A protein has these predicted regions:
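N-terminal Rossmann/SDR dinucleotide-binding element
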Residues: 1-67
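Rossmann-fold NAD(P)-dependent oxidoreductase module
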Residues: 15-19, 101, 151
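Short beta->alpha connector loops of Rossmann-like oxidoreductase domains
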Residues: 36-37, 75-76, 119-120, 172
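NAD(P)H-binding glycine-rich loop region in Rossmannoid oxidoreductase-like domains
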Residues: 54-90, 101
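Catalytic helix-loop patch of NAD(P)-dependent Rossmann-fold dehydrogenases
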Residues: 82-85, 89, 93-97, 118, ...
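A short helix->loop->beta-strand "cap" motif at the edges of active sites that frequently abuts
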Residues: 105-109, 160
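Residue(s) in the substrate-gating loop at a strand-loop-helix junction
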Residues: 115
Length: 183
């Protein structure tokens, strides 16, 4: 199975790429290597690596791909507020562009990494429920993640299955450090 991982040289992507590669998947990476100077150890050395900004993704990049794991984004609230238009372009518009190209070329599965930030500040002590809890994105980052999920869900069908998951702030050891958060 041929898997495209966007953001494969990022904090989560470096670990995920190695796991999938070691399990025998044919992994294609797409990353702009923006945080290249934040390497703790050697990062992936894929023979099938695309160095490109996610905003420039093309139909050629998704051709003959079976599934996509979409990690590429500006990955937190403070970074997303520096230039909100860029956050919108990367986190929302590029996500929808990638998914549209993928669907057009016959990609079967699209895994979207979203964020729990879309819930904002809770006004209740009730346990969080993905479907029932109110969405209250307070930042550009959170709003772009929520908008992307809404549109991706509309694109999903029997031939193009979209799954989104919403991690909270991720931490731990990775070959690519997160230089954008306080430890």
């Amino acid at each position: 199975m041929k898997i495209l991982i966007t953001g494969n040289n990022g904090y989560i992507g470096t670990v995920l790429t190695e796991i999938l590669y070691n399990q025998g998947f044919d992994v294609v990476g797409l990353d702009n290597n923006y945080f290249e100077q934040c390497n703790l150890t050697k990062v992936n050395n894929l023979s099938n690596q695309i160095i490109k900004d996610i905003r420039d993704v093309s139909i050629k990049d998704v051709k003959n791909i079976d599934g996509i794991i979409h990690l590429a984004s500006l990955s937190n609230d403070p970074l997303g507020e520096l230039v909100p238009k860029v956050t919108e372009d990367i986190n929302y518009k590029s996500t929808i562009k990638l998914a549209s190209l993928a669907k057009k070329t016959g990609v079967k599965r699209f895994v979207n990494v979203s964020s729990q930030s879309m819930y904002g500040i809770s006004n209740t002590d009730k346990e969080l429920d993905e479907e029932q809890s109110e969405k209250n994105p307070l930042t550009t980052y959170a709003a772009t993640k929520w908008k992307s999920e809404i549109e991706l869900n509309q694109m999903s069908d029997d031939n193009f299955v979209v799954t989104s998951f919403r991690p909270s702030t991720v931490f731990g050891v990775s070959p690519r450090l997160r230089c954008d958060i306080v430890f």
